[in-house]
């Protein structure tokens, strides 16, 4: 009998549109000969499954079940593709753990850690991972322009500490723009990072590990036509994404090994993507970890899967079956 898979999308952040696009991508990637697929919407004001008719039917939060044609149906697995809260920050993972639902992503603690960019990067720094100098602010805290320039110089990036898809991010090149950029970032959350700008080549590397198999994908080089890799560049085509990246074999292997090492340090699960900047000295600097990476047809992970000569359908099956098997043995 085919398993019922919930592709869980939505969320309560600015990234909901991207989440829904990723859900459509995942729906097209998963093997429909093996699984029954449903898109489930999880938002603050709606938990619902989208039926084939387009009707939204409510989810019973007690066990994440739903009714179809009067019949109660239960899910066997949840593929989480919510970018932002509650699917990327550990909240949904904690709920699924409580009800015993297998799911695709990192667990609650790892998801919460990686969602907090500042804390995650400084945690990894203790393991020898190179990171950019940065300043962290909570809402209500202030900092003078002079202190920012003294500690970080210019240019800098100002961004929400717990957001993605470049919402609320500003590249600041002049002192007069520092405070407006901080205010903009606080519009997306209660914590903000000011980070030293590093000039270099931006690359990203995907990875997943299942029992008996480790897959680290070819790197993608990100060349944006905009000031930086912002929302417009990511989703409106203002970027060249080159897979494999135009860097040396030695540097590629170094970054792939570092990505695999970060996966193990974190105790990650499912697909992750790690972003780096390579400065002139050639030593990669960690930018951030993505534990629910975008999965539209043109997103980095599908590109890297193709470049590796793999079938995205097989990758999805690996992740689903490994978690189903592991849950049975727990």
UniProtKB/Swiss-Prot annotation:
Its main subcellular localisation, reduced to a broad class, is cytoplasm
- Annotated signal sequence is none
Residue ranges of domain ATP-grasp in the record:
121-321
Q: Which organism is it from?
A: Parabacteroides distasonis (strain ATCC 8503 / DSM 20701 / CIP 104284 / JCM 5825 / NCTC 11152)
The organism that produces this protein has a lineage beginning with: Bacteria, Pseudomonadati, Bacteroidota, Bacteroidia, Bacteroidales
- State the top-level EC class: ligase
Task: Give binding positions for Mg(2+) 1.
Answer: 275, 288
Q: Kindly list the places in or outside the cell where this protein is found, as annotated in its UniProt entry.
A: Cytoplasm
Function field: Cell wall formation.
Q: Name one Pfam family in it.
A: Dala_Dala_lig_C
Point out the gene that encodes the protein: ddl
Q: What is this protein called?
A: D-alanine--D-alanine ligase
E.C. number(s) listed in UniProt: 6.3.2.4
Top-rank taxon? Bacteria
């Amino acid at each position: 009998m085919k398993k019922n898979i919930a592709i869980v999308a939505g969320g309560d952040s600015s990234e909901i549109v991207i989440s829904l696009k990723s859900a459509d991508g995942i729906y097209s990637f998963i093997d429909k000969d093996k699984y029954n697929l449903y898109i489930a919407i999880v938002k603050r004001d709606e938990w619902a499954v989208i039926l084939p008719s387009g009707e939204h039917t409510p989810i019973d939060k007690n066990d994440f079940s739903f009714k179809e044609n009067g019949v109660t149906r239960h899910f066997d697995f949840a593929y989480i593709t919510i970018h932002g809260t509650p699917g990327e920050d550990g909240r949904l993972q904690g709920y699924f753990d409580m009800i015993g639902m297998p799911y695709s992503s990192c667990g609650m603690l790892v998801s919460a850690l990686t969602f907090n960019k500042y804390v995650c990067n400084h945690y990894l720094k203790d393991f020898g991972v190179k990171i950019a100098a940065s300043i962290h602010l909570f809402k209500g805290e202030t900092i003078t322009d002079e202190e920012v320039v003294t500690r970080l110089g210019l240019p800098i990036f100002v961004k929400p500490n717990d957001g993605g898809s470049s919402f609320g991010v500003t590249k600041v090149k002049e002192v007069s723009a520092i405070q407006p950029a901080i205010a903009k970032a606080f519009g997306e959350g209660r914590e903000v990072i000011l980070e030293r700008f590093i000039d270099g080549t931006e690359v990203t590397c995907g990875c997943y590990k299942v029992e008996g198999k480790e897959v680290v994908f070819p790197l993608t080089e990100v060349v944006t036509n905009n000031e930086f890799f912002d929302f417009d560049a990511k989703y409106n085509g203002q970027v060249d994404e080159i897979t494999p990246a135009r860097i040396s074999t030695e540097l590629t292997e170094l970054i792939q090994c570092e990505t695999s090492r970060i996966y193990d340090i974190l105790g990650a699960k499912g697909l992750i993507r790690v972003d780096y900047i390579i400065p002139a000295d050639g030593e990669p600097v960690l930018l951030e970890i993505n534990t629910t990476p975008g999965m539209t047809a043109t997103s980095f992970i599908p590109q890297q899967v193709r470049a590796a000569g793999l079938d995205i359908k097989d990758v999805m099956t690996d992740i689903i079956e490994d978690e189903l098997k592991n849950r049975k043995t727990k």
